[in-house]
Swiss-Prot record:
Coiled coil: none annotated. Residues 1-45 form the F-box domain. SMART domains: FBOX. It comes from the Eukaryota. It comes from Arabidopsis thaliana (Mouse-ear cress). Pfam families: F-box, FBA_3. This is Putative F-box protein At1g19160. PROSITE patterns: FBOX.
Length: 350
């Protein structure tokens, strides 16, 4: 019999699909893989592995279905998830969270396992939610905000996935705000744009302590150029930092990167996609993210024939490379596209 320590080390090196098969090999393997200690070790090592990009497409022909594709070798379809909500799906540290039929669901795209979150009480008219990950305690949490009418303050609740408990209400009276943008979770902090009594701000929420920090001021230059309407900005992860992207003109973008949240310090990166970078005459190119590690720009667009393209643009080397999914049809050209740039396999929900 293999001693436990070497066996654990062997199991830690396996991909999630192989671990799922090992659950049926023996009671010993099952006990190890299901243990909290092993799950924490696996999640910790997963964060050090090279991340991949997960794309989500909502086809115009299947408006209520999201199609997820992983940029592996070769690129492949991961899973399809129905969603009747206008809220966008979220992918954090390997798990996908969606809203369907007014309920929240969480899915592991590798194992195809889906589970339903507990109901958080009577449904209110205005709701929004975000998912974050605590890399210290290896916990997934959902932040849920709801209110009865537009002028009422939001009720804020948190649920820790994997716990047998219920939704917990947290204090947020001193941080009254109205969420507006998609969220970005990096290094255990969840960020999103919101309107407050003092205008547009960036909200930060510590996933581990479940506490809101002081609002972050929008970069002054961004407000003077693009205005304070948050719908003009896209929040994204830029090399592990919060990025605020705005379109200057066709193929021209301004990116502000949060350098110090306490001092409200931002740096600016100007982006211009030249004809030399793209081998096609692209129509309505759009930036959807940055590749973790390489910093390549992810651009989606259609050509004059309506064919859909995904390009990785290297701004330093002034060149691009195309990503191709055989499953994507021309109808995706007018679809909504999301990119989750730090996707890693998760052992949770296996």
């Amino acid at each position: 019999m293999i001693p436990e320590d070497p066996l654990v080390e062997i199991l830690l090196r396996l991909p999630v699909k192989s671990l799922a098969r090992f659950l049926c090999v023996s009671k010993r393997c099952y006990s190890i893989i299901r243990s909290r200690h092993f799950i924490n070790l696996y999640q910790s090592r997963a964060s050090t592995r090279e991340s991949r990009v997960m794309f989500a497409f909502r086809d115009t022909n299947t408006f209520f279905r999201w199609n997820f594709f992983s940029l592996s070798q070769p690129p492949s379809s991961v899973t399809n998830i129905d969603s009747t909500s206008y809220c966008m799906p979220v992918c954090v540290n390997g798990l996908i969270c969606v809203e369907h039929m007014f309920r929240l669901w969480i899915c592991n795209p590798v194992t195809k396992k889906i589970t339903l979150f507990p109901d958080c009480g009577p449904r209110k008219q205005f709701t929004t939610w975000y998912m974050g990950y605590d890399p210290i305690n290896y916990q997934y949490k959902v932040l849920y905000l709801s209110r009865e009418h537009l002028i009422a303050p939001y009720i804020v609740e948190v649920f820790t996935f994997g716990d047998e408990g219920s939704w917990r209400m947290i204090e947020a009276d001193e941080n009254f705000h109205s969420p507006e943008t998609r969220g970005v979770c990096t290094h255990g902090v969840l960020y999103y744009g919101a309107y407050t009594g003092d205008g547009a701000k960036i909200v930060r929420f510590d996933v581990r302590t479940e506490k809101f920090g002081k609002f972050i001021e929008m970069p002054a230059e961004a407000c003077s150029i693009h205005g304070v309407y948050l719908g003009l900005y896209t929040l994204l992860d830029y090399q592990g930092k919060l990025g605020l992207l705005a379109t200057q003109a066709t193929s021209t973008y301004d990116l502000w990167v949060l350098e110090d949240a306490e001092k409200h310090e931002w740096s600016k990166v100007s982006i211009f996609i030249t004809r030399e970078m793209c081998p096609y005459d692209l129509i309505w190119p759009g930036v959807v993210g940055f590749v973790a590690g390489s910093g390549e720009l992810i651009v989606t667009a259609r050509d004059e024939l309506g064919q859909f393209h995904i390009l990785y643009v290297d701004l330093k080397k002034n060149r691009s490379r195309e990503v191709w999914f055989e499953e994507i049809t021309p109808s995706f050209g007018s679809a909504l596209v999301l990119a989750f740039t730090d996707y890693v396999e998760s052992i949770v929900l296996m």
